[in-house]
Design a protein with these regions (language model features):
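A residue-level structural signature of the nucleotidyltransferase/glycosyltransferase Rossmann-like core
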Residues: 31-32, 49, 76, 121
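Conserved hydrophobic/aromatic beta-strand scaffold that supports enzyme active sites
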Residues: 20, 68, 121-123
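Short, flexible, glycine/charge-rich loop motifs used to bind or transfer phosphoryl groups or to couple energy/partner
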Residues: 9, 66-68, 110-112
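Catalytic core of PPM/PP2C metal-dependent serine/threonine phosphatase domains
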Residues: 1-45, 113-116
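C-terminal catalytic subdomain
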Residues: 73, 78-79, 83-129
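Short, low-complexity, polar/charged sequence segments that are solvent-exposed and flexible
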Residues: 39-41, 51-53, 69-70, 97-100
Length: 129
C-alpha cells in the first residue's frame, strides 16, 4: 500500500524509484517490496539480490510484489540507487562485516559510484537474535 500511495503522489512529477523493507524482530522475517532500478541486497555468508519490479513511480508500474526473507544476527541489508554499480562483492571490502553501517554506505558510494549519476545508499545491520 505504501508504494502505491507514493506512486499516486508522484504523478505529474519526473517520477522515481523506491524500495521498502519491514523487519519483524520477533520472527526475524523481513518483508521487501521495490519498484524501479534500485538495488536491495542481503549480505549473509553469501550475497542475495532482492529484485524490484519494473517501472517508475508516478508514471507506470507493475503491481508491487512483497517478498519475504529470513534475517539472522550479523546479516547486512543494503539498498542503493542506480548511481552505484550493482556488481561489487563483499571481498572488495576489507573487514566488511566489522564496519559500521554508515562506513559501509560511505565506502560503497565512494568506491562504486558512477561518475555521471547521483548516488544514494542505506545500510542496516541485524543486531538482534
Amino acid at each position: 500500500h505504501i508504494l502505491l500511495s507514493i506512486h499516486r503522489n508522484m504523478m505529474n512529477t519526473c517520477g522515481g524509484v523506491a524500495s521498502i523493507c519491514r523487519v519483524d524482530k520477533k520472527t526475524g522475517g523481513m518483508s521487501y517490496c521495490g519498484v524501479g532500478n534500485i538495488t536491495t541486497r542481503l549480505f549473509k555468508p553469501e550475497s542475495v539480490r532482492l529484485v524490484s519490479r519494473d517501472g517508475v513511480l508516478g508514471h507506470e508500474i507493475c503491481r508491487p510484489l512483497i517478498k519475504e526473507i529470513q534475517l539472522k544476527r550479523g546479516d547486512i541489508v543494503m539498498m542503493y540507487s542506480d548511481g552505484v554499480v550493482d556488481h561489487f562483492e563483499v571481498k572488495e571490502f576489507p573487514h566488511f562485516y566489522g564496519l559500521a553501517s554508515i562506513d559501509i554506505a560511505k565506502i560503497s558510494v565512494e568506491r562504486f559510484r558512477k561518475s555521471h549519476d547521483d548516488a544514494s545508499c542505506v545500510v542496516a545491520k541485524v543486531i538482534y537474535d
